[in-house]
Amino acid sequence: MNDFVFSDIPDNVKPMASVEFDDPLTIATGDVLNWTLWLTRNFPALSSIIMRLPSSLVSMVTSSFEGANQMVQVKTSTHNLYSLSLPTHARKQIISQLVEHEKNHIGPKSKDCVMQRLLNAHRDSESKISIPTPDATLRSEAVGFTLAGTADPPNILALGTFMAARDSEMQKGLYKELKAIWPDLRSPAPSYNLLHQLPLLRGIIKESIRFTHGVATGPARLVGAGGARIGGYNVPAKASSFSAAATSDCS
């Protein structure tokens, strides 16, 4: 998901660079996924007020907002996680740092990633936007994509792994494909473009996506006696429906 949103993630926060997956971005993203998502979804005004309060005050009541604070608030600290274009006395929220890194880092950029598309939207001859996308919008989109991408991929990959584990021939074929391009597991993971060329791996992931529904939040509801129309589809009476996490899709 990070590669989909950004062209480049600094090495010190890349999940695959940490054996324990304890980099700041992964920890903060995981900590955000708790009951506060329900609060944000159902009481956005209250959630907004809480996020504007000093984090030290909120932490006296609950620690559930600490992940969100790391992601979307600015804190003062003598520790500077990123040295690139940031003063040593300030540690900006992780998302802001990633957005600044995307804008300022020297190196190849993926024109198709979310951030580059937003940064260059005003340069598109067909675009109705003539000014650069504001940083606040970039941060908002980055947070939305980053958090939304933490729910469904694990669900999809868990199903794919389970199904592949039931077929020994599929396991052998998949292992052979991966071993050919990644002989040493201690070395950095292959690039997305290289993995995308593996036909069996790509097929397993596509089928896993096809068979997996979104992560449900809240209890399922039964459609009333008269049926209902949801998302343009006629749903019969007594059918179970639920809302998928973060996306509000109905299944």
Curated annotation (Swiss-Prot):
Heme binds at residue 250. Keywords: Heme, Iron, Metal-binding, Monooxygenase, Oxidoreductase. The keyword Phosphoprotein does not apply. Pfam families: p450. InterPro entries: Cyt_P450, Cyt_P450_sf. Its cofactor is heme. Pathway: Secondary metabolite biosynthesis. SUPFAM superfamilies: Cytochrome P450. GO terms for molecular function: heme binding; iron ion binding; monooxygenase activity; oxidoreductase activity, acting on paired donors, with incorporation or reduction of molecular oxygen. Its EC number is 1.-.-.-. Cytochrome P450 monooxygenase; part of the gene cluster that mediates the biosynthesis of pyrrolopyrazines, secondary metabolites showing insecticidal activity. The role of ppzG within the pathway has still to be determined. The single multifunctional NRPS ppzA is sufficient to produce peramine via condensation of 1-pyrroline-5-carboxylate and arginine, N-methylation of the alpha-amino group of arginine and reduction of the thioester and the cyclization to form an iminium ion resulting in release from the peptide synthetase. Belongs to the cytochrome P450 family. This is Cytochrome P450 monooxygenase ppzG.
